């Protein structure tokens, strides 16, 4: 007697034939020094202390801030504890993400925390914790997404009226160690298709002129690293202008009767 619930395959079958994947087509129309246009919206989450929405072409990131609030631990701290959580939506990349936080997401959380913590006056909030939640709705390149997450998180902290000495903006560059080629604000196609194995991601405070964090990958001479750093700083300054405009716009809305 056959099992009616079991689905049997055909008695005669052939293995499937898989076509060779096509080579990625370069879609970048920007100059190597030009970053993507940015849209920034503050205060979109009414139940959060501070929030920001960052959009740069395909990159879409939402960030909320909770706190400062009393720490859940009983240990005394003379300054606030900053907690950052970076998460990718299941549909944010070409490969579907799981609901459990991956090692890469935890690493990005630590990198964002290290980039924005120098700008926050944590000593003014003892025995407290500040929680920053970063949700990537759509990603377009790991480097540019990380840099955008830094800018989005810092602008959300400013929207929460947390005392800071400056705002941190992120910037990224992709470069070829064997040639003089480089690409500011690289997208997914740039990272995948170009023969480039070097990258620089930076957190920068434009008003003070201080670099909070730099992550460099690949072989690079000191002179070229200095050149790429200057390119990242220029890009970070341009991003800062967008954040300043969004903060002024949100401030004017709150003052209107």
From Swiss-Prot:
Any single Gene Ontology cellular-component annotation: nucleus
Locations listed in the record: Cytoplasm; Nucleus, Nucleolus
Name of the featured protein: Exosome complex component mtr3
Assembly, per entry: Component of the RNA exosome complex. Specifically part of the catalytically inactive RNA exosome core complex (Exo-9) may associate with the catalytic subunits rrp6 and dis3 in cytoplasmic- and nuclear-specific RNA exosome complex forms. Exo-9 is formed by a hexameric base ring of RNase PH domain-containing subunits and a cap ring consisting of csl4, rrp4 and rrp40.
Stored PANTHER family: EXOSOME COMPLEX COMPONENT, EXOSOME COMPLEX COMPONENT MTR3
Gene3D superfamilies named among the record's database cross-references: GHMP Kinase, N-terminal domain
Family according to the record: Belongs to the RNase PH family.
Entry's transmembrane regions: none
Cited function: Non-catalytic component of the RNA exosome complex which has 3'->5' exoribonuclease activity and participates in a multitude of cellular RNA processing and degradation events. In the nucleus, the RNA exosome complex is involved in proper maturation of stable RNA species such as rRNA, snRNA and snoRNA, in the elimination of RNA processing by-products and non-coding 'pervasive' transcripts, such as antisense RNA species and cryptic unstable transcripts (CUTs), and of mRNAs with processing defects, thereby limiting or excluding their export to the cytoplasm.
MF term (GO), any: RNA binding
Keywords for this protein: Cytoplasm, Exosome, Nucleus, RNA-binding, rRNA processing
GO biological process, alphabetically ordered: exonucleolytic trimming to generate mature 3'-end of 5.8S rRNA from tricistronic rRNA transcript (SSU-rRNA, 5.8S rRNA, LSU-rRNA); nonfunctional rRNA decay; nuclear mRNA surveillance; nuclear polyadenylation-dependent mRNA catabolic process; nuclear polyadenylation-dependent rRNA catabolic process; nuclear-transcribed mRNA catabolic process, 3'-5' exonucleolytic nonsense-mediated decay; nuclear-transcribed mRNA catabolic process, non-stop decay; poly(A)-dependent snoRNA 3'-end processing
CDD domains according to UniProt: RNase_PH_MTR3
